[in-house]
Amino acid sequence: MTYQWNIRCLTAVEQEVQQQLEKELNISSAAARMLVVRGIQTADEARAFVRPSLDKLHDPFLMKDMDKAVERLHQAIIQGEKILIYGDYDVDGTTAVALMYRFLQDLASSLSPLTFNLDYYIPDRYTEGYGVSTQGIDYAAEHACSLIITLDCGIKAVEKIAYANSKGIDVIVCDHHTPGDELPNAVAVLNMKRSDCPYPYKDLSGCGVGFKLAQAYTQRYLASRLSPNSLIALLPLTQLLAMSIASDIVPITGENRILAYFGIQQLNQAPFTGLSAIMQVAGIEAKKLTINDLVYKIGPRINACGRMKSGRAAVELLLTDDPVFARQQAEEVNHHNEDRRDCDSETTKEALAQLQEDPTFANRRSTVVYAPHWHKGVVGIVASRLTETYYRPTIVLTAGEDGIISGSARSVGGFDIYTAIDSCNDLLTNFGGHKYAAGLSMHIDNLLEFKQRFEAYVADHIREDQLQPTLQIEAELQLADITKSFYNVLRHLEPFGPGNPRPLFVSRHLINHRDTRAVGKEREHLRLDVTDRVNAITGIAFGRADMAEYIQNGNAVDICYELNENTFNHYTTIQMMVQDIIPNKKLSCC
C-alpha cells in the first residue's frame, strides 16, 4: 500500500512553547515537541498529562437524566427489587455488564440486612441480534425483574423499551452510540451524545457510561461511608473500563485517558481472577501488560465468545473469583478465538476473491460484499481487513433469517460512514453505530439498490485524499535523538490510541550499517540495521523484504517508524517498528 507522509510542523508560537517546556522540564527538544503536538502549553499541563488523576473526572450529575437514573436505582435497592443488567455481546457490552454487576454485587454485600437480587442478560448474536431484544424483555418478565439497566445498547430501542414498559418493567439506558430522532421512553436515558446533554466529555465507551452511573450512585449515597475519596472504592472497576476503551476504539483523551491509565495499573497490580487467567493464556508477562495487549490479545479473545458462541461466557469469566473455573473458562475462550481466526481468515480470502472478480470494483469508491454462508461473528473483522487492503468505506454482509441480511461497516480516516448509511435508511430494517463503525440489516431484495445508493453517496462526499492512508508524522529525528531518556518520555505519554496516537517519526538518508536482510519463514520481512554515518539503530519492517537489496546496495532511504523496546538475552535496546520505507528524497512538513 502507498502512503501519504504528512510531517507535522510547529508554528512559531508552538516553537516558543517547545523551548519553554524543554527548559522548565529539563527534557530534550524532541521530547518537548511530543508534548506540544498533544496541545500541551505549560509545564503544569505536561505534569497533569503524564500523571492522570481521578480528581479530574467530571461530575457524573452533569449527564442528562443522571439524577433520575440514580434515584430509580436507589429505589430498586432499598425496596429489594430484582434488577436485570443487559449488555451487548462485544467487549464493551460484556465489560459493562461485569462492571455494573460487580458494583451492585459489592453494594448488596455491604447493605445487610437490605437485599436485592441481580441477574444479567447477553443477547444471542444469531437468534436475537444486536441490542435490546423481545426475548431479553420476556426473560426479565419471566424472572420477575422490575428494572432493566441496558449497557452499550438501547438508545434506538424505542419499540422494545415500550414493550418493556407494557410489562411493568422500568428501563435505565446507558449507551454511547449516536441517538436517533426519537429517544426511548425510559426512566432515564444516559448518553452524552444526546443533543440536550451538557456533559462535557462526549467520547465515553458504553462501559464508561455505566461507570458514570456507578460513580454517581457512590457520590450520592456512599460517599460518607467511603470518605475521604469515594472514587478509590471504584478503582478496581477501571480494569474493565480499560478493556472497553481499548477494544471499542474510542478516543483515549480526557476521561478515557484517565480511566484507561488507572485500569492498566489495576490489571498489572491486582487483576480480577478471570482477567488474570486470560492474561496467562494469552502469554502476557505478569505486571507488563500494555494497551496494545488489550487491543490485540485480550480484546479479541473476549470478543470471540460473542462471535463464535455466547457473550455470556465472557461475562462469566469476568465475574468469577474461582481460579480453577477461571482457568477452564479462559482456555475455552482461547479455543473460541482460534476458531474465530480460522473463520475470519477464510472469509477474508473469499471476500477478496469476490472483489477481484468484479470488473467494476476498480472504479468504485466503496466496498460492499455479501455471501449467505459467511459467519455473522466475523463480518466486522473482515470489513476491517478489506478496509486495510483497499482503503475504502467497507460493508460486509451475510444472511440471517426470513430474507434479512446483516453485517458490519468500517470507514477510512475522516469519512463518516454512519451518515453515509443513514442516507439509505429507508432500505434498512435496523442500523446503528458511529462515524467509523456501524452495524446494519436489510431485506435481501434491497441489497442491489443499497449498494448503488451507498456508492453514490460515498462518491459524492469522499475526498481523494481520504482514499489514501496517511502517516501523520510527529517529528523528524536524528538517530542521536533516540536515547533512553527520550524513550522514557514517550512511555509517559501512554496509553496510546485514537486521539493520542503512538508517535510516528521519520529519519532520513539512512544507509546500511552491517546486517540489513530479509527474514521470516518466507523471507517476506526486513530486519534493518541502518546508520546515519554517526549513530546506528536496528528495526523490523513487516512485509518489506522488497527493500532489502536496495538498501544492501548502499542506497539511502527515509524511514517512517514507531519506537519500542526489544529484549533479547536479557539485553534491552530501542528499535524501530517500521511503518514505511521510501528511497531518500526531500521531505517537507505540511
Per-range role (PLM):
Residues 150-205:
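Histidine/acidic-residue-rich, glycine-tolerant segments that coordinate divalent metal ions
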Residues 75-79, 323-329, 335-369, 402, ...:
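Mid-to-C-terminal polyanion-binding domains and interfaces
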Residues 2, 10-147, 167-168, 219-447, ...:
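Hydrophobic helix-and-loop "lid/oligomerization" segment in the mid-to-C-terminal part
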Residues 146, 187, 558:
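Conserved acidic residues
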Residues 99, 182-225, 234-246:
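Short alpha-helices
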Residues 5:
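Structure-specific DNA junction-binding interface
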Residues 74-75, 181-191, 530-535:
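Acidic-glycine-rich active-site phosphate/pyrophosphate-binding loop
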Residues 176-177, 375, 434, 525:
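Histidine-centered active-site/metal-ligand motif
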